[in-house]
Amino acid sequence: MTENFQIPEDLKVMLDALRRVGRPRLVGGGVRDWLLGLVPKDFDIEVAGTDFESMIRTLSPFGVTDVVGRSFGVLKVRSKATQAEYDFSLPRKESKTGAGHRGFIITPDPTLNDHEAAARRDFTLNAISYDPFSAALIDPFNGQADLRAGILRHTSAAFVEDPLRVLRAMQLAARFNFSLAHETALLCKSIASTYKELPVERVWGEWNKWAIKSKVPSKGLTVLEQTGWLVHFPEIANLRGTQ
């Protein structure tokens, strides 16, 4: 992808304002989708170098602000100009404190650099960010190479701290025809016993994405088989070998 990220005009105005108080970056799935040649449906912006109250004050003139997570630095803004909704957040650190998907303490830290902020992402291809002012991609984990190769690879060993990421790998593989890196599959296999720690609604959320958005559904099931997680879904496991 060589063309610049097509940012909505109302969001550009917000980014210009944020530039005066911090360092905004586009992050997450929107950047990934753009690099895949798709039109991003969501715009997530991470703002370093500022505090949460300054971010709220800066964005309030542009729409209705909804503080959805003050303790972990997340703000939604519904644009006055278009009624589009954008997510803004501070960079944050995660500390594992208990079992399962929710056993974390999340701490906003606007002093984190791009590499440190990206380290909490699940896969390298989701850890790419975009500087809207220089049009530069920030890619500390070589996610662009994995994206071109269609490989889901973990950013760090902390991947195993959230077992939901295995099911996220399942639905991403199915949606984008991705394959799972061998070393990532081994990590997933090492936490297969933690499946029961996951909330039912979060498990359903990942399966729902698989069911609705899959391009190659079998790729997701292959991920489950590679990782030893297929055993948790016996009804599907029993279909192996059928046509």
PLM ranges: what are they?
Residues M1-Q243:
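Catalytic cores of the polymerase beta-like nucleotidyltransferase superfamily
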